[in-house]
Amino acid sequence: MVGSSDGDQSDDSSHFERGVDHIYEAFICPLTKEVMHDPVTLENGRTFEREAIEKWFKECRDSGRPPSCPLTSQELTSTDVSASIALRNTIEEWRSRNDAAKLDIARQSLFLGNAETDILQALMHVRQICRTIRSNRHGVRNSQLIHMIIDMLKSTSHRVRYKALQTLQVVVEGDDESKAIVAEGDTVRTLVKFLSHEPSKGREAAVSLLFELSKSEALCEKIGSIHGALILLVGLTSSNSENVSIVEKADRTLENMERSEEIVRQMASYGRLQPLLGKLLEGSPETKLSMASFLGELPLNNDVKVLVAQTVGSSLVDLMRSGDMPQREAALKALNKISSFEGSAKVLISKGILPPLIKDLFYVGPNNLPIRLKEVSATILANIVNIGYDFDKATLVSENRVENLLHLISNTGPAIQCKLLEVLVGLTSCPKTVPKVVYAIKTSGAIISLVQFIEVRENDDLRLASIKLLHNLSPFMSEELAKALCGTAGQLGSLVAIISEKTPITEEQAAAAGLLAELPDRDLGLTQEMLEVGAFEKIISKVFGIRQGDIKGMRFVNPFLEGLVRILARITFVFNKEARAINFCREHDVASLFLHLLQSNGQDNIQMVSAMALENLSLESIKLTRMPDPPPVNYCGSIFSCVRKPHVVNGLCKIHQGICSLRETFCLVEGGAVEKLVALLDHENVKVVEAALAALSSLLEDGLDVEKGVKILDEADGIRHILNVLRENRTERLTRRAVWMVERILRIEDIAREVAEEQSLSAALVDAFQNADFRTRQIAENALKHIDKIPNFSSIFPNIA
C-alpha cells in the first residue's frame, strides 16, 4: 500500500506485473486514490471508501458547512450512506486473483540465485498481501512461502536479509501457526546470530521478529534454549545503543519470556535480576523457594547485593522465620550471599535480620536448625558484625549473648567455631563492644581455650580467626595472654612458626606479629621463653628480608613489619636479668638495625619503638664500654713516674671515655645516632618525639660527663630542638622529660648565659615550676636557678657546721 513503512509500492504499480489484473477506475476511491475495502454510495450515486467519506463529513460539521459531495460539491440532504456490496465483492475477487498472481510471482522469484531486485520485489508483494487482508496469510502458509522467505536470510546481501526479516515479522503478526513454522529448524538460532552480527537496521529487524515470536509462550522456551540468546538480549537492554527501538524491543522480548521460571533464572545469571526478585516477592510458596534457592547460588557484585537487600531483604527474613525447613535453608543461603558486603549488610540489619538470626543460632529444641545451617547462620552473623556496625544498643553484645557465643564455640565443630570466632573478631574490632567481650572472656576464663586454637593445623581459617581475635584482645588482656602462652606448651612456638613461614606476607602473619607485639615488653618469663624457641633470630631475619625486598606482600607488609619491630624491641628491656639478650644484640647488630629503622618515614610506631629500643641499648653502654689497657711500666718509668706525662689513648668515646662501638657497646655517639634522633624532635607525632627525647637523655645520665654530653647534643643542633620541645609544652610527659634535660643542659654556664634572656624558655620553666608534678617542679626550680630567675640561697647563706 501507499506510504508503508518499508517503502512498499502501492497496488497501482502491480498492473505492470505479468498475470496481474488491471485496476479498474471504479475500484479507486476519489478521496484516497487507493483501491477501496469498504465502498459506500451517497444519495447522489457517488461511491467512496467508508472511512474517507465519514472523515469528510466530520470536517464539514467542524467547519460549519453543510454536508456535500467532495467530488461534485453538491450539497446533500443527508449523510446517510449505503454499502456497495456488489462492488466490494468484485474488488475482493479482483484482489484475490491479484494476490494469487503475486504469490505465484514471489514463489518464482524467492531463490538465492535470482536478481536482488526480483527478490526484493517478491518480498514486498508478500508484505503487501499480509497487510492488506489478514486472511491471505493462510495462503502464504499453504504455499510454503515462509520457508522460501527464511531461505533469504542466507543471502549475502544485507538488504535482502533485512527485508526478509521485515517480511517474516509481518507474516507472523497475530498468527501462532506462522510463528510455529518460522521457529522450525535453525531459524531462531539465525535470528540470535543476527543480534550481534548484523548492521543496526538488521539487528532491529531481528529483535523485532524475536519479540513477535516471544508472544507465543511455547516459543519462549525455544528462544531461551538457544545458546547465547538471553545474554545477547540482556546485553541489548543494558547497552547505550543509539537505536532506542532495539533496546525497547529486546526489553519487551525478555518481559514476554519471564513466564518461564527457568528463563528467569538464566536472566538472573546474566545480570537481569528484577524478574527473579519479583517472583520472590509475589510468587507462590514453591516459586519463592525456587527463586531464593537460586539466589543463594548466584554470584553478585556489591551494588547488586545492596539492590537485592533493599528489594527482597524483608521477604528473605520472613522466609527465615517460617517453620518450613527448605524455605529457611534457601533464605539463609541467600542472606549469606548478600550479607558479605557492608552496604547490603546494613540494609539487612534495618530489615530486622538480627533477632531471628540469633535465635536460630542459639536455639535448641523442636524445629532446631541442623548444624550445617547453624554454620550458615554463624557466617551471616560474622559478615554483619565485621562491617563496623554500632551494636552498642543491640542485644548481641549483652553479657548473656557473649557467654552463649563462648559456650557454643567450645561445643561445636570447626566450621561453626570458625564463624563464631569471626563474630567475636568483629565485636572486638569495635571500641564500643570490645569491653563487654573482654569482660565475658575474663570472667569465664575462656582465654585458655581460645589460645589452643593457635595450634590448629587442619583448618587455616579457624586458626586465622583465633589469632585475629587474640590480637584484638591483646591490648586489653596482655598479661593473661602472656601467661596463657607461657603456661601451655606449643602455642608460643606455633605463633613464631606462623610468623617465620617463608611465604608472601599473609594476614595471619601480620595478626600473629601484632599479637606478640602487644604482650608486656618487660615480662621476663615470656622473653626467656621466646629466646628458648629461637623467636628473636627468626624475627630479625624477617625484618632484614622485608628491608632488603626479599619478602613480598604489600597488603600486610606495614602492620607485619611494625609487629616484628615491636617484638624485637622487647629484648632490650631485659638486659639486667638476661645475659643472652646482650649477646643476641651484639651478634645480630641490633642497634644498627634500630638506627636504620629510625628513618622509616610514614611509619610512626616503628620510629617510636626503634627510639625506645635505642634508649634501652644506650643505657647499657656505660657498663659495656671497655677501658683501654694501661701502658706497660718499665724500671726507668717507675723511677721517674712522678715526672712523666700522663699516657694519652686516642680513639676513645667522647661520652663514655672508653672503647665504644654501636655493635658491641650500643653507643649512640659512635654509631652516629644522635643526629637522627635529633631530627625526630620535629616529628608531628608526640609519641615519636617522646621516644627520641628519652633516647637522647641517655647521654646526660648520672655517671656520665654531663658537660661532654651537652656538647655532643650541641654539635648535633640538639639543644635548640630540646628547648623548642619544652616551649611547645605538647604533653605532660614530654614536658617532664624536656625539663629534666634542659636542667642538665643549663648546668653549662655558657649555655645558661646565652639563653637566660629568652622569655619563652623562662615562661616554660616557670609554668613547669608552678604546675608540674613534685619531682618536675624541683627540677624546674634548679633550671631557673641556673639562669638566675630564682636566687640560689645556698650561695648566700653558707652552711653552718
Swiss-Prot record:
Expressed in leaves, root vasculature and guard cells. Disruption phenotype: Premature senescence under low light conditions accompanied by enhanced ABA biosynthesis, accumulation of AAO3, and reduced photosynthetic capacity. Keywords: Repeat, Transferase, Ubl conjugation pathway. The gene is PUB44. InterPro entries: ARM-like (IPR011989), ARM-type_fold (IPR016024), Armadillo (IPR000225), RING-Ubox_PUB (IPR045210), U-box_domain_protein (IPR052608), Ubox_domain (IPR003613), Znf_RING/FYVE/PHD (IPR013083). Pathway: Protein modification; protein ubiquitination. One of its GO terms (biological process) is protein ubiquitination. This is U-box domain-containing protein 44.
